[in-house]
């Protein structure tokens, strides 16, 4: 367990550590046990975050030229699907002709890292890892290489004399990985057969959106690498299902953006998409009409204010404005507005959402990028489509 804490919105949360740190710790521990011919219960590793981790070592087994052990994943107070699972490393000394072709890209002539049971394989272009390679990201690979080199140096060994022409082969595996991967984003990211060994800092920051955003961005990158020039962004399952069922949109061309409207729009620009369709429930996308680019309620709400302001600009009577302002949901607003004959406000909101998106993305004439917005009610009916 890691005793590192952060405060978010006045609440105290415990940090955790990534699957990459687990793989690194298990590898280092296995090497120490192989060198010293004894078991250890704990190992210390450094992280790119600058935080040292003392990791408990479990499930130790050994042979003449190999040791394997595990570290249990601890997500801190940011619990995800991989929390509590065992990440194993098997470190062995092998002859050069025993090094498998299926391995990670790593800048070393003596250390080779591959994956075993429960670790996924990359199947699509667009990620930082080449298709066909183990789903072990570059930062964990660098962490493992660094700890292996430092451990050998501290032991006072000349690595090439010690190895005598042999190689160090590390196999990362997770017996529960294939089942747990079903509860992750991996299938959307073109990773099949298991979990990913990930982490850019080695530390899991509780209540942080960064990992989520990176996963969504990676999904966009895959779609672009497939040659797609148009993409559909939806807040969640409701928008996805409506766009697919009612408008025949290709499910493979739809990416969920969650609350990160602005972030995902900027990613589409960075990746060079030519057309972006934003489709979803009016309760989420009305916020974009008011220039709000993170739709989470704790960031901003303003649904009533945006609706009332735009109705007022259309000349709606004060009593209607008060009635709409008193509504507890956007769907209740929609029903009242339809009955009052002011449905044109939905078209205004769709156009403003598209316009605000373009302003946020700083699109100029040279960008050649089209933005369309579709607003739906909860029953899936189209309220309006932008036309700007």
Give short role names for the model-derived ranges.
Residues 378, 383-388:
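C-terminal, non-catalytic interaction/recognition modules in large multi-subunit enzymes and RNPs
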């Amino acid at each position: 367990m890691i005793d590192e804490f952060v405060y978010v919105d006045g609440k105290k949360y415990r940090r955790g550590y990534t699957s990459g740190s687990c793989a690194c710790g298990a590898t280092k521990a296995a090497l120490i046990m192989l060198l010293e011919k004894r078991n250890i219960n704990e190992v210390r590793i450094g992280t790119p975050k600058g935080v040292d981790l003392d990791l408990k070592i479990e499930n130790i087994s050994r042979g003449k030229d190999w040791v394997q052990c595990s570290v249990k994943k601890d997500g801190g107070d940011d619990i995800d699907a991989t929390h509590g699972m065992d990440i194993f490393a098997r470190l062995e000394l092998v002859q050069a002709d025993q090094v498998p072709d299926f391995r990670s890209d790593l800048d070393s002539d003596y250390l080779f890292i591959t994956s075993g049971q429960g670790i996924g394989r990359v199947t699509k272009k667009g990620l930082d890892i080449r298709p066909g390679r183990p789903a072990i990201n570059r930062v964990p690979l660098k962490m493992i290489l660094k700890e292996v080199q430092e451990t050998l140096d501290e032991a006072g060994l000349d690595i090439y004399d010690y190895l005598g022409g042999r190689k160090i082969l590390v196999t990362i595996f997770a017996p529960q990985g294939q089942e747990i991967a079903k509860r992750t984003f991996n299938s959307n990211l073109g990773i099949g057969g298991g979990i990913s060994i990930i982490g850019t800092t080695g530390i899991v920051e509780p209540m942080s959106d960064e990992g989520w955003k990176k996963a969504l961005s990676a999904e966009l990158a895959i779609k672009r690498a497939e040659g797609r020039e148009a993409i559909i962004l939806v807040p969640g399952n409701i928008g996805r299902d409506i766009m697919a069922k009612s408008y025949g949109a290709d499910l493979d061309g739809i990416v969920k953006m969650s609350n990160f409207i602005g972030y995902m729009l900027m990613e589409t620009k960075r990746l060079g998409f030519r057309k972006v369709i934003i489709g979803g429930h009016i309760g989420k996308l009305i916020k974009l009409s008011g220039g709000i680019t993170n739709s989470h309620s704790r960031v901003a709400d303003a649904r009533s204010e945006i609706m009332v302001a735009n109705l007022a600009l259309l000349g709606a009577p004060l009593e209607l404005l008060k009635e709409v302002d008193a509504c507890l949901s956007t769907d209740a607003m929609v029903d009242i507005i339809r009955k009052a004959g002011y449905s044109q406000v939905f078209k205004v909101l769709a156009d403003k959402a598209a316009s605000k998106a373009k302003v946020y993305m700083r699109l100029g004439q040279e960008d050649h990028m089209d933005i369309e917005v579709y607003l739906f009610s909860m029953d899936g009916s189209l309220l309006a489509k932008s036309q700007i």
